[in-house]
């Protein structure tokens, strides 16, 4: 957004596997619907996810609520306009649009149709399904086959995956703004906080401004949306500067080559 403030303007954004009552992705885009100039926000939930087992106000207050389907079917939520007349489009305007025919798996026909409708896909997919495995299409390939823009979380190890690396090599996708040396921290539920504080601080969690935040060290962003960090100049040292101030290198060159200059090779 800092690089291109209009990146989401007039766009339909799909958040698959993101229940709006529990997903910070949905909350974030709902809160910034007007600022980003979104056309439509679509969120789906997966029936077998932990958050899906809890009823949301959006679902309970809807005439479409069905207790049996709640436990077995994925759900569809949409946000398009100021439904409550508050003068602003926000999370209170999210509409429960009904149950999916299946469990909400991203590979299903109905979620794939939502993918095709969307301009941009953003989510935190199951890391175990990031790439194709055992003949089942992976999440990244599912997006790329539709030629969609995306921002998704994944494990750093996916960089070396035979299905992922070629896309990085061809500059078709790239890593997000976060440096690989930086950890990610997430807001977590109260129950999860209690579980975390039994672990060692720094390994599983970190207290930031008095709040217990879950830590994820091995995650990074994958995207094909341009961002400013890709255009920042690399600060590279010069050979002359390195020879002048690198005492260890000077000592090695003098010992092995009898002079303090870089050796030249003809190969």
Give residue spans per PLM region.
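Class I S-adenosyl-L-methionine-dependent methyltransferase catalytic core
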Residues: 1-267
């Amino acid at each position: 957004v800092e690089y291109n403030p209009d990146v989401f303007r007039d766009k339909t954004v799909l958040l698959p596997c993101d229940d709006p009552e529990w997903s910070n992705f949905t909350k974030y885009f709902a809160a910034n619907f007007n600022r980003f100039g979104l056309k439509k926000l679509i969120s789906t939930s997966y029936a077998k996810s932990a958050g899906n087992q809890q009823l949301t106000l959006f679902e309970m207050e809807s005439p479409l609520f069905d207790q049996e389907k709640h436990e077995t079917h994925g759900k569809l939520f949409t946000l398009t306009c100021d439904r409550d007349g508050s003068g602003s489009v926000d999370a209170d305007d999210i509409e429960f649009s009904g149950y999916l025919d299946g469990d909400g798996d991203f590979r299903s026909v109905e979620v794939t149709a939502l993918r095709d409708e969307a301009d941009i896909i953003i989510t935190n997919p199951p890391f175990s399904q990031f790439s194709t495995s055992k003949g089942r299409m992976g999440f990244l390939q599912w997006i790329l086959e539709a030629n969609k823009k995306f921002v998704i979380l994944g494990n750093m190890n996916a960089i070396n995956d035979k299905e992922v690396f070629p896309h990085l090599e061809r500059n078709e996708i790239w890593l997000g703004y976060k440096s690989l040396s930086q950890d990610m921290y997430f807001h977590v539920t109260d129950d999860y906080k209690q579980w975390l504080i039994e672990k060692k601080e720094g390994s599983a969690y970190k207290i930031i401004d008095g709040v217990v935040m879950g830590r994820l060290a091995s995650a990074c962003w994958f995207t094909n949306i341009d961002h400013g960090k890709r255009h920042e100049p690399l600060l590279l040292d010069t050979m002359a500067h390195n020879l002048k101030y690198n005492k260890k290198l000077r000592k090695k060159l003098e010992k092995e080559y009898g002079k303090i200059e870089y050796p030249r090779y003809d190969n």
